Amino acid sequence: MASNKIIGIDLGTTNSAVAVMDGDKPKIITNPEGARTTPSVVAFKNGETQVGEVAKRQAITNPDTIASIKRHIGEAGYKVTVDGKSYTPQEVSAMILSYIKKFAEDYLGEEVDKAVITVPAYFDDSQRQATKDAGKIAGLDVKRIINEPTASSLAYGLDQNGKDEKILVYDLGGGTFDVSVLELGDGVFQVLSTNGDTHLGGDDFDQKIIDWLVDEFKKDNGVDLSQDKMALQRLKDAAEKAKKDLSGVSEAQISLPFISAGEAGPLHLEKTLTRAQFDQLTADLVERTKAPVENALKDAGLSASEIDEVILNGGSTRIPAVQEAVKNWTGKEPNHSINPDEAVALGAAVQGGVLTGDVKDVVLLDVTPLSLGIETMGGVFTKLIDRNTTIPTSKSQVFSTAADNQPAVDIHVLQGERPMAADNKTLGRFQLTDIPAAPRGIPQIEVKFDIDKNGIVNVSATDKGTGKEQKITIKSSSGLSDEEIDRMMKEAKENEEADKKRKEEVDLRNEVDQLIFTTDKTLKDLEGKVSEDEIKKAKDAKEALEKAQKDNNLDEMKAKKDDLSKIVQDLSVKLYQQAQEAQGQAADGAQANAGDAKTDDDNTVNGDFEEVDPDKDNK
């Protein structure tokens, strides 16, 4: 039976994390390796799907490894092809979510089918819908999609005991950047504004180091490493490590032996990257985060001096230059009370607790990050809902026809901030037909936008004259139909079963190898201690198991393993009994010797002694 608990998942670009409410506090669930975060990496090898640390470790040698898929979620037409099979970003994300779901279930000891999943605050509707689809494919009922900065504010605010304050959350992750301004007080978490860049994060900082290394190596050796896939993967790993090292030390050594080969033989890469050089390489990336901070403050109607706390979120906020920049822009020393890698998952778990009723007196008021509207005459974008409007929300406006006797109107739904429709993102199109013939401007067409608590959009158009209505729920522009999602769910389940079966096979083979080793050792220990018939029986059973192993007959291996286990167990009991008997005999012998010793004492001769003074002769 499924648990009533709702897990909180931070589905990150480079790393993911999961948490659950434990009493009145959220708690991170560690993965099978014991780590608190899991690399968002999927690899395909020999028909097997690997996720997390094990997938990341073999990325250098396996070209069928997918990382940072979150950067493409909701992207129309984007697919990754491995061994002739294409995967959408939703499917790859679902593999990560399935893995997280499985180890969360192992931790809780019960099935989990409900989750709160976080997304960057600046994700548009199609990206949110695609994230929800990924959860569904993984077998999760996604109860809520919440924004990452909002989630981290929940993790922070839970310990503030209802204190009234305005906070700015600066969230720089592996692939996305968000900034949100919130007002906290009496258990109410109200988002005042949000801004960001969905294509800016730690990956971009890594890329700056990679580009620098490629340029330096080309200058030194005349070889372009950017054309070598395996070398690039090694460079990526080295760049990520150097970036992390430079958060704690002033220079990082980058050493990659045998990175390539030239006419004279193997070539090695040896470089020292100082923090000053790194800051110079990435200065433009840090600067790109400034405008969103200023815009978020402006939209919230606040100045930097009115912010009480600045919360840093995301692994990339460990970069000293980022921390210094935020301090300069806000005039505040950033608050380091929450772990930037874990806060989002913890906050998602709090939201899960709110939904189940385990967390009381917490109200979350989030906002839509981008304006929503439709295309009107002349290709103009007419907004119906402005950005930073608190959700859920609903807004309607009446439009009319642009031509006489127009029988239908096309509703082109858009999201963005640009004045012209062509410059904004299309969320969907639908048509309201059978409009009665009338001069232009006469028909009354009411267009209504609804945004639900997940930030997902529903649009309807109604002819007020006839009452005829047409509705659309905006689907992800990556175009997954319900049938496709159902098919992917089925495939994910089948893969899960196949992976489970494969693991059982590996476990069985390991158990067989171990049993054969144990049998050989036991038989050696029993030489001359049990009858030849018993030894032969064990050897025959061992040979039967070895034959089943050689024939790769799994059913026979199971049966023969059980047979041999019983025989070896019986022999081991005999060996143990013999050892006990030998100990008993030894103890009896010791007692007998003790008796003899006592008898000897009776014949002891008492002698006289005289104390001699060694100095007597010298006196």
From Swiss-Prot:
Induction entry: By stress conditions e.g. heat shock.
Encoding gene per record: dnaK
Protein name, entry field: Chaperone protein DnaK
Composition-biased stretches (Low complexity): 579-596
Family: Belongs to the heat shock protein 70 family.
Entry-annotated residues carrying Phosphothreonine: T176
Acidic residues bias (residue ranges): 608-619
PANTHER family documented for this protein: HEAT SHOCK PROTEIN 70KDA (PTHR19375)
Free-text function comment from the UniProt entry: Acts as a chaperone.
NCBIfam families in UniProt: PRK00290.1 (NF001413), prok_dnaK (TIGR02350)
Chain intervals for the UniProt region annotation (Disordered): 579-619
InterPro entries hit by this protein: ATPase_NBD, Chaperone_DnaK, Heat_shock_70_CS, HSP70_C_sf, HSP70_peptide-bd_sf, Hsp_70_fam
Pfam families according to UniProt: HSP70
Entry keyword set: ATP-binding, Chaperone, Nucleotide-binding, Phosphoprotein, Stress response
GO molecular function, one term: ATP-dependent protein folding chaperone
